[in-house]
């Protein structure tokens, strides 16, 4: 048997695993960092296999497999290859046809995986067909050796050794899919033993004999929801890379999934790309291939990896792009355009999912836009310069040219003004919209735009003049006031050599900066240097005000990543507190406040349901894909079981946009009341209680503070993630 979908039990236990990992790291921070430092001097030779100078473009079978369990057959892969050839997309660079998990049926006389004879009767003929279409063929496998090959104890090709001779003793799991104990099904290889590398060479030689051009090595640890060294596939990754070099065939190697950044030097040295996230597909968790929260996860994770990508050190793989099959993709057209813009900006491989025979007109227009696709081939991955409701990414191409992405992370329409000083220059002599192919500049001082919900702009900007860095003051977390379980821990890569962990899961478990001083009241930029593996969020408060949300992600508890958000500060001393009542935030290194108080103020305000006033049976609870990693549940079924936002503040009386991010499986209703007025019924539908879905309605508010309540006296209401209030445009 081969793994197909990720074992749901592993995902269900992810949060408890992270909590355990967190405690281990705080008590012994050198356990993994020492290994990281030993490896930091390793030379990068990810390109020794002759590929990987630029991210590839292609298609993968996995997304379609998640909604059609019988999809993975030779006949269907042949059809997809023919569809790619007929689509015209190869002229735009799409070349790879990648077969994911489930193709293998047994093992040959030398313990090497061979195809299922029923579903893949002639894989060499299939690969020849793919090559005949002018494409490249990819295949999936995993580290270690599976039980049938171990039980057969087959001889290793060209050696005197047998499969059992190369296994780690005592027997233990050889990848993230392996069971605990000494009967793991997926057995670990000991690469210090003779015959081990030769076995890997023989497997890759078999793939090469079929004509394979790409290998996805899945379940690699540290990573893949297993962040310790109990499995440790670093030696496997090195062995696969060496085997590819020995084969003499140019074969791209991608390792997967959610890799541990503490061992980045190994991943950079031996692989062309590494998956930095969980799967983008819902895999039964929603009714579509993917949805916006899964895309947003990539925006959260990427800042921690943004300095790790490039032509000689491999690429950050954000997983499949399901953007060309219409409604089954689970994304609006604006979301699809934003997703492709983001993948391109950060130079991630662009791997289409879904069924290539069903590409719709909008999807085909997206993936055949050569100006947008060229952004992904610059070899200069973009970096985030602004986080929050509007995110900005920029890639400096040299000679005054920049690729710039501006993203609206909310479902409301918003207006944004981006000062060019944020990007390091004063003015723009030319601005080109890469989606519309139109010149929209010059633009002095900055760029203003209106963005649809989850919409974006992808720009080529030619800047002139130098913008001097704004004055900045740093504040170390270990020097701030620690509350509750917050604790200082060693962190050699952190500013000052220390960090603060133990935050969250209680309102008192926080770190408070009491001495944040500015000369003038206004909007500043706050850089937050934090560390996490996977998704975590801060709920922070300025001067005792309402909670504000900073959603983060990453791949290390030892390597700080920076993200910057706008923050309003009063003249003089301010207090900023970081924590979260219902979830774990990232560990915190420091914050830095910069600017002169004149940064453009965000147009919208977010209010988290889990920290609103919860009545009756309503509870605030952890929710992995929700804003702030929390939501309010058990709403309705009684008049008292409601959520009340009592601090919704707007500058003037009028009609505003109200975004409601909810979670439900099936039809449920809210009864919403504004300022104690008559209730409005909102009938909502959804397919999951894990991934929030937005709806946007107009709402009349008066100047100052307003109250908005959600409940259902006679029936159950959806769970509630947050609301967003924004002006109407």
Describe each PLM feature range.
Residues 42-136, 144, 347-385, 401, ...:
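Conserved structural scaffold segments of CAZyme catalytic domains across common CAZy folds
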Residues 55-61, 93-100, 136-141, 213-218, ...:
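Structural recognition of the beta-strand scaffold that forms the well-ordered cores
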Residues 65, 80, 84-227:
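Aromatic-lined carbohydrate-binding/catalytic grooves of carbohydrate-active enzymes
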Residues 136-150, 241-262:
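Aromatic-lined carbohydrate-recognition surfaces of secreted/lumenal glycan-active proteins
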Residues 172-178, 192, 246-355:
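Glycan-recognition surfaces
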Residues 337, 343-346, 351-353, 386-425, ...:
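Carbohydrate-binding surface patches
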Residues 347-410, 492-504, 512, 572, ...:
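Glycan-recognition and catalytic regions of carbohydrate-active enzymes
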Residues 414, 423-428, 451, 455-729:
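Extracytoplasmic
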């Amino acid at each position: 048997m081969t793994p197909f979908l990720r074992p749901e039990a592993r995902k269900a236990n992810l949060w408890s695993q992270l909590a355990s990992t967190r405690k281990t790291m705080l008590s012994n921070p050198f356990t993994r960092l020492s290994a990281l430092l030993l490896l930091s001097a390793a030379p990068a030779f990810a390109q020794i296999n002759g590929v990987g100078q630029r991210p590839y473009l292609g298609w993968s079978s996995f997304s379609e497999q998640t909604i059609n369990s019988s999809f993975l057959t030779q006949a269907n892969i042949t059809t997809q290859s023919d569809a790619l050839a007929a689509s015209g997309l190869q002229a735009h660079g799409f070349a790879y046809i990648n077969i994911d998990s489930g193709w293998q049926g047994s093992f040959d006389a030398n313990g090497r995986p061979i195809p299922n004879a029923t579903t893949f009767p002639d894989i060499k003929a299939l690969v020849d067909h793919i090559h005949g279409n002018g494409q490249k063929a990819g295949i999936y496998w995993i580290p270690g050796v599976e039980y049938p090959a171990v039980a057969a104890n087959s001889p290793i090709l060209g050696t005197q050794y047998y499969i059992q001779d190369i296994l780690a003793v005592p027997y233990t799991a050889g990848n993230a899919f392996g069971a605990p104990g000494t009967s793991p099904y997926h057995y670990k290889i000991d690469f210090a033993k003779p015959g081990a590398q030769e076995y890997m060479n023989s497997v890759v030689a078999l793939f090469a004999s079929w004509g394979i051009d790409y290998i996805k090595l899945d379940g690699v640890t540290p990573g893949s929801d297993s962040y310790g060294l109990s499995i440790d596939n670093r030696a496997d990754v090195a062995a696969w890379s060496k085997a590819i070099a020995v084969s003499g065939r140019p074969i791209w190697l991608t390792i997967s999934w959610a890799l541990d950044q503490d061992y980045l030097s190994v991943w950079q040295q031996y692989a062309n790309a590494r998956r930095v996230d969980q799967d983008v597909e819902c895999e039964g968790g929603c009714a579509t291939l993917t949805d916006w929260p899964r895309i947003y996860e990539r925006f959260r994770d990427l800042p921690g990896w943004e300095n790790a990508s490039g032509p000689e050190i491999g690429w950050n793989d954000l997983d499949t792009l399901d953007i060309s099959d219409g409604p089954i993709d689970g994304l609006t057209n604006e979301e699809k355009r934003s997703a492709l813009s983001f993948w391109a900006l950060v130079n991630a491989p662009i791997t289409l999912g879904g069924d290539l025979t069903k590409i719709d007109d909008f999807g085909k227009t997206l993936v055949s836009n050569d100006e947008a696709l060229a952004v992904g081939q610059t070899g200069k991955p973009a970096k985030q310069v602004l986080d929050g409701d509007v995110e900005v990414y920029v890639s400096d191409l040299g000679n005054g040219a920049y690729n710039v992405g501006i993203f609206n992370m909310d479902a409301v329409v918003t207006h944004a003004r981006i000062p060019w000083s944020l990007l390091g220059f004063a003015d723009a002599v030319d601005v080109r919209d890469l989606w519309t192919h139109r010149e929209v500049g010059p633009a002095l001082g900055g760029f203003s735009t209106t963005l649809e919900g989850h919409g974006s702009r992808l720009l080529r900007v030619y800047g002139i003049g130098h913008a001097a860095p704004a004055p900045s003051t740093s504040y170390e977390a270990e020097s701030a006031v620690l509350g509750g379980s917050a604790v200082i821990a060693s962190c050699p890569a952190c500013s000052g050599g220390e960090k603060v962990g133990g935050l969250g899961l209680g309102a008192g478990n926080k770190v408070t900066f009491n001495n944040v001083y500015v000369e003038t009241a206004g909007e500043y930029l706050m850089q937050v240097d934090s560390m996490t593996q996977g998704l975590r969020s801060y709920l922070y408060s300025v001067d005792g005000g309402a909670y504000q949300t900073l959603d983060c992600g990453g791949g290390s508890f030892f390597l700080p990543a920076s993200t910057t958000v706008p923050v309003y500060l009063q003249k003089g001393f301010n207090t900023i507190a970081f924590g979260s009542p219902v979830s774990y935030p990232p560990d915190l290194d420091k914050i830095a406040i910069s600017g002169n108080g004149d940064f453009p103020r965000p147009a919208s305000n977010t209010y988290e349901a889990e920290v609103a006033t919860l009545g009756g049976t309503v509870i605030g609870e952890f929710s992995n894909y929700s804003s702030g990693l929390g939501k309010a549940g058990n709403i309705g079924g009684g008049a008292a079981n409601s959520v009340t936002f009592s601090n919704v503040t707007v500058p003037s009386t009028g009609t505003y946009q109200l975004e409601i991010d909810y979670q439900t499986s099936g039809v449920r209703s809210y009864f919403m009341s504004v300022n104690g007025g008559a209730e409005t019924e909102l009938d909502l539908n959804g397919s999951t209680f894990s991934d929030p879905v937005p709806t946007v309605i107009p709402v009349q508010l008066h100047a100052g503070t307003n109250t908005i309540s959600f409940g259902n006296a006679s029936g159950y209401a959806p769970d509630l993630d947050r609301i967003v209030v924004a002006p109407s445009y």
